[in-house]
Amino acid sequence: MATLINFNDTNKLLLTKQPSLFIDLASKDWIASANQAIKQRGAFYVALSGGKTPLEIYKDIVINKDKLIDPSKIFLFWGDERLAPITSSESNYGQAMSILRDLNIPDEQIFRMETENPDGAKKYQELIENKIPDASFDMIMLGLGEDGHTLSLFSNTSALEEENDLVVFNSVPHLETERMTLTFPCVHKGKHVVVYVQGENKKPILKSVFFSEGREEKLYPIERVGRDRSPLFWIISPESYDIADFDNISSIYKMDIL
């Protein structure tokens, strides 16, 4: 079982009731998004997320690859990347491709972020603008950090204020590093933007994002993603939320599925 909640104009939440269902629904949503885009415009442009949770989703996608109508029409991009070799366990590209190679996507449709290139952000933006109609991804996969960051958009960093560029290098002082990341202008162009929340350690930040009474300002980067025309879609594992927090939401905004 899972419950779909229209929380507000900019956020839709899918609360899964079993950990295994979380991965299953995330994978099905990805495959459905791919098939819909391929049917509608002959290609699926997706920005992948790093982290452990997406790797589980990728594995399930590969297991169910026979449900993809045409993997050769998939174009892979990344939402952010560390300054790490592609052979490193820190490389979002390397970790994802160790799994997604089994989809047999043409190499010329796989675009990694070249963090070793000082002009890499500019080059990646040009790729997005040249390859993707209107620079609008069909799907953008996001994670949620315990501090409320998403992609490599951390609080108190310059990338949060970027209004024009779609891709930047973002200095993250508290991590003593720099990362390449998509920006809010790029994410806001996305057709289907999904954030995956898994782990009991995410419960405090999720509660703070949705149930901080009396707080009007947006404290966390993740809160700046959703838009009225394209609400942020949350897929949430059961250990990451307290169901009691949602009891006061009217049933007209809830729908049980499965």
From Swiss-Prot:
Hydrolysis of 6-phosphogluconolactone to 6-phosphogluconate. NCBIfam families: pgl. The lineage of its organism: Bacteria, Pseudomonadati, Chlamydiota, Chlamydiia, Chlamydiales. Pathway: Carbohydrate degradation; pentose phosphate pathway; D-ribulose 5-phosphate from D-glucose 6-phosphate (oxidative stage): step 2/3. It holds the Pfam family Glucosamine_iso. This is 6-phosphogluconolactonase. It is an enzyme of class 3 (hydrolase). Its EC number is 3.1.1.31. It comes from the Bacteria. InterPro entries: 6-phosphogluconolactonase_DevB, Glc/Gal-6P_isomerase, NagB/RpiA_transferase-like, PGLS. PANTHER family: 6-PHOSPHOGLUCONOLACTONASE. It comes from Chlamydia pneumoniae. One of its GO terms (biological process) is pentose-phosphate shunt. Belongs to the glucosamine/galactosamine-6-phosphate isomerase family. 6-phosphogluconolactonase subfamily. Keywords: Hydrolase. GO terms for molecular function: 6-phosphogluconolactonase activity. CDD domains: 6PGL (cd01400). It catalyses: 6-phospho-D-glucono-1,5-lactone + H2O = 6-phospho-D-gluconate + H(+). The keyword Iron does not apply.
